[in-house]
UniProtKB/Swiss-Prot annotation:
The keyword Iron-sulfur does not apply. This is Aminopeptidase C. CDD domains: Peptidase_C1B. The keyword Hydrolase applies. Belongs to the peptidase C1 family. It comes from Lactococcus lactis subsp. lactis (strain IL1403) (Streptococcus lactis). It comes from the Bacteria. Its EC number is 3.4.22.40.
Amino acid sequence: MTVTSDFTQKLYENFAENTKLRAVENAVTKNGLLSSLEVRGSHAANLPEFSIDLTKDPVTNQKQSGRCWMFAALNTFRHKFINEFKTEDFEFSQAYTFFWDKYEKSNWFMEQIIGDIEMDDRRLKFLLQTPQQDGGQWDMMVAIFEKYGIVPKAVYPESQASSSSRELNQYLNKLLRQDAEILRYTIEQGGDVEAVKEELLQEVFNFLAVTLGLPPQNFEFAFRNKDNEYKKFVGSPKEFYNEYVGIDLNNYVSVINAPTADKPYNKSYTVEFLGNVVGGKEVKHLNVEMDRFKKLAIAQMQAGETVWFGCDVGQESNRSAGLLTMDSYDFKSSLDIEFTQSKAGRLDYGESLMTHAMVLAGVDLDADGNSTKWKVENSWGKDAGQKGYFVASDEWMDEYTYQIVVRKDLLTEEELAAYEEKPQVLLPWDPMGALA
């Protein structure tokens, strides 16, 4: 069909005759789309009270960076630390894990680049499009914790580049694309690619040390708790993790809900090229139905433990009110537009994927033990939402949540066996390879 002037004129006339749309036009052009379509009743239907409420700790702030997955993981440890050691507040250093993730991702990128990939291969174009970025997956975070440990924020504080990472990413990716050309040329010429790679990694390390600061290898840290008890630590970041967190991360698994035809339930999946630490923990997911997905999250919170989760946070999101609900905005009554795509359809057609990781810090259950709304701890600071916390309706969770991390002992024998199987490898651009 060609769009003719007669056809467009008809659209003009149809709009002009629609008094409702003309009224909506006046409201939206003055106040903005979402402000004009906001549903007031959605606030009253999603009050922040929950039958299971695990934390009221002050929230953290990732600022202008894509470190949500790190903040979410470290926040789960943080709550444990605050409760166990009776501190008023505490944060682990998100900048410390950021440094080592950037370093390891650079090495990971170089390893993929020196693989057997032709220049016209779409996979090479995919790698070069974004050699590294801030985002990541749970298993990638585990790989960093296991290799480098963690430190208190007071020991390795924020830098300009960790809080606002755009410049760092721009120039690190510029350097890595140049490194890719150098490495592939070295291979073509029969040179010592490993020796060249070591020199290039020194440049990367120097760049990160200058922009983020040199991370500590050993440190001293002391604090007093609410009972005025004095505690002191001297040692390495890995020793600090073992002493003050001590969680065996191999006891946790990533569970996803991806209802697309190419991903049968109760099977495990990984994604080509997705990772950070060469030789570290493999990114791996178990796909389950949504009802089971939610039951696993509930079971972990009933046991007193918060849940790392990944979602598409921009969908139906009211940031100022702290609401994630399917009825936040009324497009149907105002614009005669209805969004009817299924969760699978949105994944298949590029409308949705995981964009953000947060923490499930509570849930409201009805008399039958079914979830009605969820308490979400975000990492956008105290001015977003309700002192940094959000309320997600159960329907929103169904439609826009894709990943949780839960203890292995919550899985059935059949689920655990499915997880332990050799995973199906998904294409690099699969939506389940999206980085939070």
